[in-house]
Amino acid sequence: MGKKQVCPPRALPPVPSFCSADDIPLSRPKKRKPKGKTPLDDIVQATVRRQSESSEPLTPEPQDVPPQRKRKKKKVPPDSETSFTQQNTASLFQNGNGVDVPEAEETVVRKQRKRTKKARPAETHSSNELEVEEDDIIEDEHRRSPDQQPVFAAPTGISQPVSKVFVEKNRRFQAADRAELIKTTENINVLLDVKSSWTTRDVALSVHRSFRVIGLFTHGFLAGYAVWNIVVIYILAGNQLTTVSNLLQQYKMLAYPAQSLFYLLLSISTVSAFDRIDLAKASVALRGFLTLDPAALASFLYFTALILSLSQQMTCDRINLYTPPSENGSIWTAGMEEEILQPWIVVNLVVSILVGASWIFLSYRPELDHSEELMFHTEIEEFPQDEREMLKSQ
């Protein structure tokens, strides 16, 4: 019992009996593998190869390969099964599908892939044509060879302008010449009706300008009317005022209408003359009088004539109510007519001279208007320097 029991040596397994050639299926000749590689390395290389193929850019789907028939595996005895599986692992993973494909079929698939890659530039070119506008016009230099163009691509040509253009008229498209159409469109001037907003300053300037035009006609008419009035008075009064009674009898019907019209025209002319000077600034108005400005002189003469004509209004009332001194209720006494009418005739003569002189001064420079200039000046000061130049140019 003290001695250790020695185990008998391990017996080798029985050598399998070699079967006949009919029982063992024929297999492809075994490829030599490089030293230092194991089946696991082959599996890793196959998986990396499949990932690289999947990472390639998308290409059009290859043509469908007809399904391949699976080869029936014959049953192999258990002792030869291990060696057979080791031989076929590399071929199974090389296909990636687990299907053993012969070499001839593998070359066909590779050729089909190369053909599909040739059609790839044509598809990318067509997508670029839709995105880039500069490539829409194809020149002769950039034309591709017929081998590179896709089979089913539409024919492309050089884009050139057509001489005729189709224009829609009365719900129908009619052909028209491009040159004539361009000429007609250039000759049409489209005027936009822009309604500018009026301010109080614009209204004041428009009224001022319109009243200045009316004043010009009034000045001329008043000068002519004053000359006519004084001529009629002297004709009716006679030489050295010998026929004063004749003047009173003939002129009493014209005293009120003539003097009223004269006063109206004189007042309009006076206001129009004062509108041409700036009375808001006394220094400017005084400087105009001292420098003999035509507008300042005309306004002064009109104002003087207006005061003189108003001073003789009572005499005009007495002329209108004239009755011979011999009649009862007459306000005229015998021998006093000449003394009353002589100052009235002289005043009318002076007024006529003043009105005529004012008209001459204003007609010398009718566009002279200091009020309008000052109003524009204050308006321009509100704008910056750039806008001032624009307004002056207008």
UniProtKB/Swiss-Prot annotation:
**Any one biological process term the GO annotation gives:** cilium assembly
Membrane topology classification: Multi-pass membrane protein
Residues annotated as transmembrane: 213-233, 254-274, 288-308, 344-364
Q: Where is the composition biased (Polar residues)?
A: 80-97
Subcellular location, in the record's words?
Membrane; Cell projection, Cilium
Residues annotated as region Disordered?
A: 1-135
Its job: Component of the transition zone in primary cilia. Required for ciliogenesis.
Disulphide bonds in the chain: none
What's the protein name? Transmembrane protein 237
Name the gene behind this protein: TMEM237
Q: Name one GO cellular component term.
A: membrane
Which domain of life, per UniProt? Eukaryota
- Mark out the compositionally biased spans (Basic residues): 110-119
Name the major location.
membrane
Per the record, the similarity remark reads: Belongs to the TMEM237 family.
Keywords, A to Z? Cell projection, Cilium, Cilium biogenesis/degradation, Membrane, Transmembrane, Transmembrane helix
One Pfam family here: TMEM237
- What InterPro entries does the annotation carry? TMEM237
